[in-house]
Amino acid sequence: MKSYLKFLLLSLCILTLASCSGEKTTQSAASTEQNKKEIIIGTTVGDFADMVRDQVKPELEKQGYRVQLLEFTDYVRPNLALADKSIDINIFQHKPYLDDFAQSRHLDIMPAFQVPTGPLGIYAGRMHELSAVKEGSSVSVPNDPSNLARALVMLDKLGWITLKTDINPLKASLADIAGNNKNIKLVPLEAAQLPRSRHDVDFAVINGNFATSSGLKFTSALYLEPGYTYVNWSAIRTADKDSQWVKDITAAYNSAAFKQYAFKRFAGYKYPESWGIQATQPASAPAK
């Protein structure tokens, strides 16, 4: 009986020590995250990277952070890098894309705050006027599902194609094209390749960040996407949502200094809804 009691007491001691050790480990991890002073930011090349270099990095460094910028040329690796902790936050995508990617890849990531975003637009390729479209005209479009959907909705508004009426426009696909009277030839490409595709197609649908990084001006667009559904968001790991560094970087992107910088440097962009101001109106579609 005494041996049994000794064994029981020993077991309880071991369990208590293990519990305390686990609690200390959890508290230590939480403390480390709260005291985090190195932030790795991932963006696509171009405007989002410029925002970090010009304004956000200097502001965070004033607060004692060490900031590293990693630039990507595609829309897949930034989210995978975020999920595997190669980076701490990424800035390149709108919410429909983020939601779809996170769900399909089973990633525990979430939106944090909006950032100024260049609108999707149709730019001249071999043809320089929308009215020049003809039978068999070619149009390069983004090949990722959410941005392809945006392009299809734009072409539908222009009357170049007709989409089914009972679809979710945020998820429109090639299979949802109900009519193509002009036999428009769609050429899906990675978004980063779209500016260079203009020499090979009649028109190109180009994302705002890649348009500006290739030297295109929004004023040269033949048509700009209306609405603000696709203003881009930053993305973080869900576990980090209450971290102090997330609060600090959010504040940096919403500071008066950053807003003034954005209004001057990125005139014509669509700004975060929380700012309560939009500088431009999108080009309107011609009558069908």
Residues covered by each model-derived region:
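C-terminal motif of bacterial Sec signal peptides marking the signal peptidase cleavage site
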Residues: 15-19
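Short, polar/charged alpha-helical segment
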Residues: 38, 45-68
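Short helix-initiation/N-cap motifs at beta->coil->alpha
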Residues: 69-80, 167-196
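A conserved helix-loop-strand patch within extracytoplasmic ligand-binding domains
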Residues: 112-162, 259-260
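A bilobed periplasmic-binding-protein/Venus flytrap-type ligand-binding module shared by bacterial periplasmic
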Residues: 119-130, 230-245
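Periplasmic-binding protein-like
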Residues: 149-156, 253-274
